[in-house]
């Protein structure tokens, strides 16, 4: 009997030790999770404070040394507004950590668990030193691709559209692109393959003054259009090319030109006075963004959406040979006439 009681007591002691061990593990686990959450909130609070102080410092420097970029009456407000601009992602993250901080305080009952101590604040200079560590050429690439209208490519596309295409193409006083093309067809008894202005955008960005092709011949241009622009009666001209090889027994003409801003950018890249390594490194991003933004402007504006045909292409084929623009147009017309024949048939 006594032996059985001793065995039972030993079993109880073992059970108690097991429960105590589980309790200790559970306690340490909860403490570890609580400390992790508290330290995470402290680190985030330290980073936010360091960022705020950095923005404040830059605001002071901007106010003192860059006053010429602001109007006197709203200089302070504009600088503060710009310095306190945060992305939506940053705002949501900070709000999330603030919520986590309040939850931590509600559990522990001690606000000191989430307030940064001097040990954390002492690391703020590291943020100031390494805050630009994440910047790279990829950062510039992402910035160029964003839709803000401030990059080189979007600026070229906007100037090209608002200063040229939007002025010369729409119909105003019987001088729009379609009217001039119809007059041209009647006058010379020809047919345009595409009743739009074709704009070539090769990735090489270079286009000769006369578009080179084995099967393209330069013809008489469309009638010159004169438009008053900023006090100057500017002439607007559109070149016309004849496809030397017939498609289904018919000769086609095309109003066609290269994207002049791309040619200007090509020249800027190869000039010792204006070229930068960033321009050369990101030229493909600029080329694609120019096309994307210009296409968006053309499609958005009602007067131009059906008047322009953008052709973006690689200047060289897989063998390294120059792509023949005339061959591209011929293939396009062959496909177009084939589809029409199939519809009729």
Curated annotation (Swiss-Prot):
TM stretches of this protein: 90-107, 122-144
Native source organism of the sequence: Drosophila eugracilis
Function: Facilitator of innate immune signaling that binds cyclic dinucleotides produced in response to infection by bacteria and/or viruses, and promotes the activation of the NF-kappa-B transcription factor Rel (Relish). Recognizes and binds cyclic di-GMP (c-di-GMP), a cyclic dinucleotide messenger produced by bacteria such as L.monocytogenes, leading to activation of the peptidoglycan recognition protein (IMD) signaling pathway and activation of Rel (Relish).
Keywords of the record: Antiviral defense, Endoplasmic reticulum, Glycoprotein, Immunity, Innate immunity, Membrane, Nucleotide-binding, Transmembrane, Transmembrane helix
UniProt signal peptide: none
Molecular-function GO terms, alphabetical: 2',3'-cyclic GMP-AMP binding; 3',2'-cyclic GMP-AMP binding; cyclic-di-GMP binding
CC terms in the record's Gene Ontology section: autophagosome; endoplasmic reticulum membrane
Resulting phenotype, residue 164 to A: Abolished binding to 3',2'-cGAMP and subsequent activation
Organism placement in taxonomy: Eukaryota, Metazoa, Ecdysozoa, Arthropoda, Hexapoda
GO biological process: activation of innate immune response; autophagosome assembly; defense response to virus; innate immune response; positive regulation of macroautophagy; positive regulation of peptidoglycan recognition protein signaling pathway; positive regulation of type I interferon production; reticulophagy
Membrane topology: Multi-pass membrane protein
UniProt: 3',2'-cGAMP binding residues: 159, 234, 237, 257, 260, 264
InterPro entries hit by this protein: STING, STING_C, STING_C_sf, STING_LBD, STING_TM
Subcellular location: Endoplasmic reticulum membrane
Residues linked to a glycan: 88, 189, 272
Name of the protein described by the UniProt record: Stimulator of interferon genes protein homolog
Stated family: Belongs to the STING family.
């Amino acid at each position: 009997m006594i032996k059985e009681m001793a065995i039972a007591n030993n079993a109880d002691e073992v059970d108690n030790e097991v429960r105590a061990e589980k309790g200790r593990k559970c306690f340490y686990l909860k403490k570890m999770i609580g400390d992790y959450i508290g330290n995470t909130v402290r680190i985030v609070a330290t980073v936010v404070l360091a960022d705020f102080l950095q923005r404040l410092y830059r605001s002071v420097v901007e106010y003192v040394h860059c006053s010429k970029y602001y109007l006197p009456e709203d200089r302070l407000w504009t600088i503060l507004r710009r310095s306190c601009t945060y992305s939506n992602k940053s705002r949501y993250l900070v709000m999330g950590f603030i919520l986590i901080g309040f939850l931590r305080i509600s559990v522990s009952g001690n606000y000191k668990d989430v307030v940064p101590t001097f040990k954390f604040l002492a690391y703020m200079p590291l943020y100031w030193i390494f805050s630009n560590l994440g910047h790279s050429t990829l950062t510039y690439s992402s910035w160029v691709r964003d839709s803000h209208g401030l990059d080189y490519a979007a600026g070229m596309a906007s100037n090209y559209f608002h200063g040229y295409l939007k002025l010369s193409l729409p119909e105003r006083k019987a001088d729009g692109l379609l009217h001039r093309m119809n007059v041209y067809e009647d006058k010379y008894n020809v047919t345009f393959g595409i009743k739009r202005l074709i704009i070539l955008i090769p990735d090489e960005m270079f286009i000769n003054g006369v578009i080179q092709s084995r099967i393209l011949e330069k013809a008489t241009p469309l009638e010159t259009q004169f438009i008053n622009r900023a006090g100057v009666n500017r002439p607007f001209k559109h070149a016309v090319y004849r496809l030397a090889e017939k498609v289904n027994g018919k000769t086609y003409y095309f109003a066609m030109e290269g994207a002049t801003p791309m040619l200007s950018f090509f020249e800027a890249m190869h000039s010792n006075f204006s070229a930068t390594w960033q321009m050369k490194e990101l030229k493909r991003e600029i080329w694609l963004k120019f096309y994307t933004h210009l296409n968006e402007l053309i499609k958005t504006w009602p007067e131009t959406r059906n008047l322009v045909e953008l052709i973006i292409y690689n200047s060289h084929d897989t063998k390294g040979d120059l792509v023949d623009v005339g061959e591209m147009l011929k293939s396009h017309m062959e496909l177009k006439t084939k589809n029409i024949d199939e519809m009729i048939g």
